[in-house]
Amino acid sequence: LIMTSQAYRQASRRLAKIDEIDPDNRLLGRMNVRRLEAETLRDSILFVSGQWNPRMFGKPVPVMEDEVGQYVVGVSTNDSSNRPTGKTVSLGTDAFRRSLYVQVRRSRVLSFFDAFDAPAMEPNCTKRPTSIVAPQALMLMNNEFVLAQSRAMAGRFQRLAKGRLDAQLGLAWESALGQ
């Protein structure tokens, strides 16, 4: 119900006239800027890329260790000695389900979530840490998931804009900023 309210759906643009009347935004003249949590950030990337799978319920999306030691969405095909077998298992569109469905284990936190302050998987996690550090920017520039979703987003905008560069840029701007 709150997400459909007018106050929640407002723009976060600051206007001098409103800032004079209500500098602390107690009257909710605008939406306060808020930091995206790890799960919300991943879901937003999936949605903007056009890959997002809205299917609800069902089995969790599995997490595995990749060849460089990061935990990523996927099915491990290692043998009983934990050696790579070279086999791959496709998750299809299940790999693009909401982060709510990503398997959570204390020993296997998705590396993307870990970089963006996912909650500690311990009995008493009363407060979620918040940080702004260099590894977050590096994750957004170099992570294979982010790069793949960026390519999917670019392809989607090329199709929608029918090759017109100005239209592609407009779509990217509107999608990235939610306007």
Regions found by a protein language model. Give the residues of each.
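An acidic, gly/pro-interrupted, aromatic-rich
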Residues: 7-177
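Short, functionally critical alpha-helical segments immediately adjacent to catalytic or ligand/cofactor-binding
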Residues: 1-4
